[in-house]
Amino acid sequence: LLKAHPEFAEVLIDATEQEVPQPTDKLKRKHAYSGKQHDHTIKTQIVATKDLVLHVFGGLPGSLHDMTVLRASGVMYRIPLAVKVRVDKGYEGTENAYPEADVQAPIKKKRGQKVTTLGKAYNHLLSVLRMPVEHHFARLQKFGCLAGLWRGPQSGHEDIFCVVSGLLNFRATGRFELA
C-alpha cells in the first residue's frame, strides 16, 4: 500500500491486546498471559497513517513484547526509508534495530536520571502526533467482535481485524458509508 501511495510521509505503529478465555493447557496459558493487562490476551499490531490502516499483523500471544511483534511482522523492511515511523515506549530499541529507518520514539529516562524538560516536551509532542493510531483502535473496538472477549480461534483473529480495518478504510476514503 505504501508503494501505491507514495504521498504518505509518516506511519504510526502500535499494538493492542484483546482478552481471550483462559486456555486449559498450562503452556498455552503461560504464553497467553499478558503482565501488562493482567489477563490472557491476543496481541495485534497495526501500521497506520492519519486516516488509514495500512497493515495488520496479529493473532499472537499476549505475553509477547511489542518489539518482538514488530520484528516478527517484518513490516519495517517494507516501509520506504523516506517515510517517518512513529512508535511508542513499547518499541524501545527500534532506532538501534533499524538504524536506516527514520524512527521517532519517546525518550525514556535512564536509571538514576530524569528526563529533561526538552525531552518531556518532545515526548508530549510525539504523543500528540501519535494520537491518530489510538483513534484507529477506538474505531476498531466499536465493532463488538474486537471490543470484548475474543472467543473465536486465535488463527482467525487477524483476519477479522483486517476485515474491520478494511471497512473503516472504505469509510475513511468516502467509498463506503456505514448505516
Predicted features and spans:
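Short, well-ordered secondary-structure "scaffold" segments embedded in the functional core
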Residues: 1-179
